[in-house]
A protein has these predicted regions:
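Transmembrane alpha-helical segments and their short flanking loops
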Residues: 111, 312-407
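Hydrophobic transmembrane alpha-helical segments of multi-pass transport and channel proteins
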Residues: 51, 89-93, 97, 227-232, ...
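Short amphipathic alpha-helical coupling elements at transmembrane boundaries
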Residues: 39-50, 79, 135, 143, ...
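Signature of multi-pass transmembrane helix bundles
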Residues: 3-7, 13-17, 24-28, 32, ...
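Membrane-interface alpha-helices at helix entry/exit sites of multi-pass transporters
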Residues: 76-83, 187-194, 284-299, 328-330, ...
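Transmembrane helix boundary and interhelical junction motifs in multipass membrane proteins
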Residues: 56-60, 196-199, 269-277, 291, ...
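Membrane-water interface of transmembrane alpha-helices in multipass transporters/channels
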Residues: 36-40, 78, 213-221, 248-258, ...
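Helix-loop-helix junctions within the multi-pass membrane cores of secondary transporters/permeases
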Residues: 259-342, 396-397, 403-407
Length: 407
């Protein structure tokens, strides 16, 4: 049994793809002929989604509080940390903005129709900018959690996080409790994720049965557009940053960082690529160890530019496909929440899935979109991790040029 468990963990990505393919085939050829198949997969899919959503709000709260606390303690590392944080936050905000505007301009998902049940969680209401401001502070945090108001949960998380930094040592006991709760949330989600192949199968069957082959075509098109956005952002934004701020040839930069970028693409892990990233920028681009030793690990934690693009594209794609209107005020809200979630849930198992679930809830998308997203999450994650790592190394080059490093 232990041997099977280890084998399954090692091959879970392949199992997810197998679940996706079987789900598509079942939805196309069996679900409309055998009602019991559609009934059973719909029920099991709902159970899987409920288990996943069960920990989304606690995880968002804990991870953001811990993220803010870690950033606060990192101030002791000095001006390199501050400059790196500024660079990463600016590029993440730019990535989120691009991810929301471009899909709206090209009408991403328009013409695609996903027939899904509406979400059980109340969507965040955004009638005006004034209403947005008025609804920022939760009068009852428990009600915010219970009612699924992600905006108020995010603000409450910020308040707790910055307050814990302000009170210093007196906040350490509570911080340890939140850290423990964060680990519990991660453990529960990682356990649920072991059932992802079954969950993907069960959630994709009703979608394909209702929408036919258009589901496959639309998702394939979405992946192509997403990858164009990923690497277009890397070439334009990071290329301009290393040229203008880093005084380095973009051609030289991209050639030098290629080994680390390819490793990140294959492993889907920014953290696992840290040693190779440091080697590339130090040996090939002349970045000092002092800069790379701070910027690369920090970037692996907080620099989630491609995740911001991914989340924004997916929200707009599913909104158009499910005929959910995203207003201008809602776009602003999703933009701000996207930046916060990208920094607050870094490099954790299921982190991107948790971020998407939070944003999908905020936008009022049907619960069924989660199953569709999870089915292609690995393919998305490969490109996203690659671009994030490129951004980490671009930050190193910029900081090396812009900051006076004391001997």
């Amino acid at each position: 049994m232990k041997g099977f468990y280890q084998w399954y963990r090692k091959h879970i990505t392949g199992a997810i793809f197998a679940g996706l393919i079987l789900g598509i085939l079942t939805g196309l050829f069996l679900a409309d002929k055998f009602e019991v198949v559609l009934t059973a997969t719909s029920a099991l899919g709902s159970i899987y989604m409920n288990a996943l959503n069960m920990m989304i709000f606690p995880l968002v709260f804990c991870s953001i509080v811990m993220g803010i606390a870690s950033i606060g303690s990192a101030k002791t590392t000095g001006k390199i940390t501050g400059a790196a944080m500024l660079f990463f936050l600016c590029t993440t905000a730019l990535a989120s903005f691009m991810g929301l505007i471009i899909p709206r301009l090209i009408h991403l998902g328009r013409g695609v129709k996903f027939e899904m049940a509406t979400s059980d969680i109340q969507a965040t209401k955004m009638d005006s900018i004034l209403d947005t401001v008025k609804s920022l502070i939760p009068s009852n945090p428990v009600k915010a959690f219970a009612g699924g108001n992600m905006l108020q949960v995010l603000v409450f998380s910020l308040v707790i996080g910055f307050t814990l930094i302000a009170i210093g040592e007196k906040g350490e006991p509570l911080l340890k409790v939140i850290d423990s709760l964060n680990e519990v949330c991660l453990k529960i989600i990682s356990t649920v994720m072991y059932f992802t192949p079954i969950g993907v199968f069960c959630t994709i069957v009703p979608v394909v049965e209702a929408n036919g082959t258009s589901t496959i075509v639309s998702l394939a098109t979405q992946l192509v557009i997403l990858y164009i956005a990923f690497f277009g952002f890397a070439l334009v934004v990071y290329g301009a940053a290393v040229k203008v701020l880093g005084k380095t040839s973009p051609i030289r930069f991209f050639r030098a960082i290629m080994p680390a970028a390819l490793n990140a693409f294959g492993t889907c892990s920014s953290s696992a690529t840290i040693p190779l990233s440091k080697q590339c920028v130090e040996d090939e681009l002349g970045v000092s160890n002092q800069v790379s030793s701070i910027t690369i690990p920090l970037g692996a934690t907080v620099n989630m530019d491609a995740v911001s693009i991914l989340m924004s594209f997916m929200i707009m794609f599913f909104a158009n496909a499910c005929n959910v209107n995203i207003s201008i005020s809602m776009m602003v809200l999703v933009l701000l929440a996207n930046v916060l979630l990208s920094v607050g849930t870094p490099g954790i198992p299921g982190g991107a899935i948790a971020s998407f679930a939070a944003l999908a809830t905020m936008a009022g998308l049907p619960a069924g979109v989660m199953g569709v997203y999870i089915s292609i999450n690995t393919l998305c994650d490969m490109g996203a991790t690659c671009v994030n790592v490129i951004g980490d190394m671009a930050g190193c080059v910029v900081l090396q040029e812009q900051i006076d490093i004391e001997a």
